Amino acid sequence: MRKTVIAVILVVLILVSVGIGLEIDRPSTGLVVYTADAYVAESDALIANFHNATGMAVEPAKGGGSYTLAQEISQGVPASVFISVALSTYARSSLGPRYSGWAIAFAADQLVLAYASSANSTVEKIVGLFSTANSTENASQKDAAYRNAFMNLTSGSVRIGISNASSDPAGLRAYLSLEIAGSLYENSQSFFTKRISENKAVRADSNAAELVSPLLSGNIGFLYIYRSAAISKGLKYIELPGQLSFGNSSMSQFYSEFHYNTTAGDQSGAPIYLYASALANGTDPAASVEFVSYIPGNDSFLSSYGMKPLEKPLLFNNTQPPAGIRGMVSAGRIVYAGPIPA
């Protein structure tokens, strides 16, 4: 009898321990949102609003460089929704088996040069030069003033934070912006990108968010980052001209004329949009589509982050989108904008 009782106790203990183990290892049943590192705060706000409206469980956003996240997603991480700042990350070549063939652009942003409130005199001098250029009305004098500002910025007297162009679109756009500046102010597209390399003026990291701490500590003087990220992180910033900021959708053709080479190949300029898509083979396909469908019309709060919610989001697709998205197109709430690049 005693042996029987002991055996029963042992079985119970084993079952309890196994149950505990299963509880620990059990995967989350909530939606998993992967988002560009600069937009974690905005994505978390969207997630909270969606949860409050629907009651659906969504995990806090997982951030990283958009190109790096696309690679991780293609390798099978349990992502449901992908919020990226680069349309090319939704291509089949980027997402592999997770490619769904569609994405919507729902908000616009722009590139800025951020600096810390405790900036030193050299940084403040360069800020002043950009301010002078911005306020100059005469066109030729304005170009000369911007040339002077960029000559000082790229002289090596301060270090500039630029994320890796192959892992983070913010870094790609920083180099594209410098290429455009070279074309406009020096008649030599690669002038400023070569100059910062020769003067060892750049501190790089995998994504722009990793460079905020060095900026605040004074290890770098400036950081190329999106305006919304600068605002959410409490940074001061220089607004760049429309030609250099990728913040003017009417200049799309102009931006596309400039290219920069990364490990993924030749990349061209484009207006900065924040995109979202439900991934193929996701953790909860129906809920993923519902989350993306929720964004249009419920993203006006993004203006407080310095973003511009699109009055009519743009659909990019190579495959037939889900019924809910098609319904929004039919109702005129979303407009077709073209294919996703290969």
Where are these regions (language model features)?
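Exported/periplasmic ABC-transporter solute-binding proteins
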Residues: 16-19, 23-67, 74, 117-119, ...
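Short, conserved beta-strand segments within well-ordered enzyme catalytic domains
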Residues: 34, 82-84, 105, 114
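Short hydrophobic/aromatic-enriched beta-strand-loop microsegments
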Residues: 81, 101-105, 237-241
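Structural alpha/beta surface segment adjacent to cysteine/selenocysteine redox centers
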Residues: 89, 108, 117-120
